UniProtKB/Swiss-Prot annotation:
Catalyzes the attachment of glutamate to tRNA(Glu) in a two-step reaction: glutamate is first activated by ATP to form Glu-AMP and then transferred to the acceptor end of tRNA(Glu). This is Glutamate--tRNA ligase. The gene is gltX. It catalyses: tRNA(Glu) + L-glutamate + ATP = L-glutamyl-tRNA(Glu) + AMP + diphosphate. The keyword Cell membrane does not apply. The keyword Ribosomal protein does not apply. It comes from Methanococcus aeolicus (strain ATCC BAA-1280 / DSM 17508 / OCM 812 / Nankai-3). It is found in: Cytoplasm. GO terms for molecular function: ATP binding; glutamate-tRNA ligase activity. The lineage of its organism: Archaea, Methanobacteriati, Methanobacteriota, Methanomada group, Methanococci. GO terms for cellular component: cytosol; protein-containing complex. GO terms for biological process: amide biosynthetic process; glutamyl-tRNA aminoacylation.
Length: 561
C-alpha cells in the first residue's frame, strides 16, 4: 500500500494547502478516484488512509506542507502548471566554435525502459539545442549481460522516442583499441597484472596495503599481459595504480581488465580479455571527443576513478553532469526479471503492460512526445525525483484527446430488462468538440447491459435516456420498470446516472489493464468502425488504444483515465 499512500498524501497536501490547512476528505476522495480509477475497488482503504494522513498533517505548518508537496509532486502546487515559467535547460562550459558531442550509452541487455529514457532524451535535447552530435554507444563488454536482439531493439526504441542518433559505436568492435591503451598504461608503470585471490586482495585493500603484484616490473607485467591476451593464463586481472590509501576503498587500485570465458554473442570466442567500464568509458569518451557527459549521481565515484586514467594520459576530461536518481514506482523495470518472466510465460513479451519498457508504454498508447516532454521537464537536477505518472498522463491526454472518439463500454456486464419503455433511438456526439466526427447511434429496446450494481426499489437514470426503478434482481439479471424521462425527476430523487449498451448488436470487447488483467465487456455497435492504433475514450472508464480486431472481439489496451 506504500505506493497508494504516496498518491493519497500528494492529494491531501494539495487540498490542505488550497483550503489553508482545512482539507476536505470528500473532495480528496473524489479527486483520487477520478484520477486513479483502479483504486475504486479499494475505496474503503483509500478513505481510511485519507483520514490517517489528515490527522498526521493537521498540526504541520502550511509552509512545511508546501515543502513536502514540492518534493513529492511540484506540479500539484500550481493549478495551472502550464503557466509557470520553466527555466530553459542549458549546458555549462560550452566552448564557442567547438561542437557539442554527447553520448547515450546503454548496455544491450534488453530494450529500453522509462529509466533509460531520461538519459536518451536529455542527451538528444542538448545535442539538438547546441547543433551538436549524439553518439549511441552500446556498452557490451560483459558477454554475460548481452541480449543479441537488443542491439536493434535499442535503435528502434530511440527512433520511436524521437532521439536522433548521428553515429553508432559498439564497444565489442573496439577491443583491440582498449588493449592498446591497456598496454600503454602498463608501459608507463600505471597498471599491473594481479593474480591475487579476490578475498585476499579485498582484505589488503580494506587495510590500505598493496599486494605483491603491485611491485612487479614493467617487463614482467607486459609478459603477463601478453599471456592474458594469448589465452596462456587464467585467474588474473589488470589493476590501475591509484592511491592505495584513498579514503574510498573502491578507488584503491581498481581493476580495468578481466578474463571472461563466456562466448560473446557478436565475437564468439575470439576474445576473452575484456575492459571494465572505467577503462573503456575513459578511452571512448576521449577518442570520440565527448564534450559533455550526462549521468546519474551514482556515477560520481566512477568519475573520480576515470580521472586517474585521463590524468595518466594527459587528456582533458569532458564536462560531467551528474543528476539525481529518478524514482519510478509501478511498472517492472528490472531487465533480468522481465527476461526471466518472458521465458517462463509469466509475461507476454517486452511490451507486456506490466513493464516500464518503451515498447510497453507504446502498446498502452503513451505517445513518445509525452515521454520526451516529461523527461525534459525533470531536467538534470541533482536532487532525487519521483516520476509523476499524473504529469505524463496529462500531457498524453492533451495529445490524444482531440482524435479520441467517445463510446460507452460496459465492463463485467449484467443484463437489465426494463418494462414499459418505448423503443427509442438516440444519437450522441462521437466527440464533444469535433463535429466532423458526426454522431453514434444507440437503439434502446428495453434489453440492455450495465456494469453497475443496482438496488431494488431504487431509481436510476439511464444516461441520455430514461428514469427507471428496479423491481427485482435474479441471478445476474436485473428487472426494472420505466418511470419517466424528465432529468429533473432523477435529480430530485438523487438517482445515480448509469451508462448502458443495447444487448442487440453489442460488440464483445476486452480491455487489458496495466496489471495485465483482461476486463471483459461490451461496447456499443458503432465501436466496430475503429481501426488498430486508434485511440478512443470509453466514457466513465478511460482512454484505450485499439490493439487487435477479431471477427468476434475487439481487444484494447488501457492507456489512462
Amino acid at each position: 500500500m506504500s505506493d497508494i499512500r504516496d498518491t493519497i498524501l500528494k492529494y491531501v497536501l494539495q487540498n490542505s494547502i488550497k483550503f489553508k490547512g482545512a482539507p476536505n476528505p470528500k473532495a480528496i476522495m473524489g479527486k483520487i478516484l477520478g484520477e486513479n480509477p483502479d483504486l475504486r475497488k479499494k475505496a474503503g482503504e483509500v478513505s481510511k488512509i485519507i483520514a490517517e494522513i489528515i490527522k498526521e498533517i493537521e498540526n504541520m505548518p502550511l509552509n512545511e506542507q508546501q515543502a513536502k508537496l514540492e518534493s513529492l509532486a511540484p506540479e500539484l502546487l500550481n493549478s495551472k502548471p502550464a503557466e509557470r515559467k520553466k527555466k530553459e535547460l542549458q549546458l555549462k562550459n560550452v566552448k564557442e566554435g567547438a561542437p557539442v558531442v554527447m553520448r547515450f550509452a546503454p548496455n544491450p541487455s534488453g530494450p529500453l525502459h522509462l529509466g533509460h529514457a531520461r538519459a536518451a532524451v536529455l542527451n538528444d535535447y542538448f545535442a539538438k539545442k547546441y547543433n551538436g552530435k549524439l553518439i549511441l554507444r552500446l556498452e557490451d563488454t560483459d558477454p554475460k549481460r548481452v541480449m543479441p536482439e537488443a542491439y536493434e531493439m535499442i535503435k528502434e526504441d530511440l527512433e520511436w522516442l524521437g532521439v536522433k542518433i548521428d553515429d553508432v559505436i559498439v564497444q565489442s568492435d573496439r577491443l583491440p583499441i582498449y588493449y592498446e591503451y591497456g598496454t600503454k598504461l602498463i608501459e608507463m608503470g600505471h597498471a599491473y597484472v594481479c593474480d591475487c585471490e579476490a578475498e585476499e586482495f579485498r582484505e589488503l585493500r580494506a587495510n590500505g596495503k598493496p599486494c605483491v603484484c603491485r611491485d612487479l616490473g614493467v617487463e614482467k607485467n607486459l609478459e603477463l599481459w601478453n599471456k592474458m591476451l594469448n589465452n596462456e593464463i587464467d585467474g588474473v586481472a589488470v589493476r590501475l595504480k591509484t592511491d592505495i590509501e584513498h579514503k574510498n576503498p573502491s578507488i584503491r587500485d581498481f581493476p580495468i581488465f578481466r578474463i571472461e570465458n563466456t562466448p560473446h554473442p557478436k565475437t564468439g570466442t575470439k576474445y576473452r580479455v575484456y575492459p571494465l567500464m572505467n577503462l573503456s568509458v575513459s578511452v571512448d569518451d576521449h577518442l570520440l571527443g565527448m564534450t559533455h557527459v550526462l549521468r546519474g549521481k551514482d556515477h560520481i565515484v566512477n568519475t573520480e576513478k576515470q580521472k586517474y586514467i585521463f590524468d595518466y594520459f594527459g587528456w582533458e576530461m569532458p564536462e560531467y553532469i551528474h543528476y539525481g536518481i529518478l524514482k519510478i514506482d509501478g511498472p517492472i523495470l528490472s531487465t533480468s526479471k522481465m527476461s526471466e518472466g518472458i521465458k517462463n510465460n509469466e509475461f507476454t513479451g517486452w511490451d507486456d503492460p506490466r513493464f516500464g519498457t518503451l515498447r510497453a508504454l507504446k502498446r498502452r498508447g503513451i505517445k513518445p512526445e509525452a515521454i520526451y516532454k516529461s523527461m525534459v521537464d525533470i531536467g538534470v537536477k541533482q536532487a532525487d525525483v519521483k516520476y509523476s505518472w499524473e504529469n505524463l498522463h496529462a500531457v498524453n491526454k492533451d495529445i490524444i484527446d482531440k482524435d479520441a472518439r467517445r463510446f460507452f463500454f460496459v465492463e463485467n456486464p449484467k443484463t437489465l430488462i426494463i418494462e414499459g419503455a418505448k423503443i427509442t433511438t438516440i444519437n450522441l456526439r462521437a466527440h464533444p468538440s469535433r463535429e466532423e466526427f458526426g454522431t453514434r447511434e444507440l437503439i434502446f429496446d428495453g434489453n440492455i447491459y450495465i456494469s453497475d450494481d443496482l438496488e431494488v426499489n431504487k431509481m436510476y437514470r439511464l444516461m441520455e435516456l430514461h428514469n427507471i426503478v428496479v423491481e427485482k434482481i435474479e441471478n445476474n439479471t436485473i428487472y426494472a420498470k420505466y418511470h419517466s424521462d424528465d432529468f429533473k425527476i432523477a435529480k430530485e430523487n438523487k438517482a445515480k446516472i448509469i451508462h448502458w449498451i443495447p444487448v442487440k448488436d453489442a460488440i464483445p470487447t476486452t480491455v487489458i489493464n496495466t496489471e495485465g488483467e483482461k476486463i471483459k465487456g461490451f461496447a456499443e455497435k458503432d465501436f466496430k468502425i475503429v481501426n488498430i492504433d486508434d485511440f478512443v475514450q470509453f466514457e466513465r472508464f478511460g482512454f484505450v488504444r485499439i490493439d487487435e480486431k477479431k471477427d468476434d472481439e475487439i481487444i484494447c489496451y488501457y492507456t489512462h483515465n
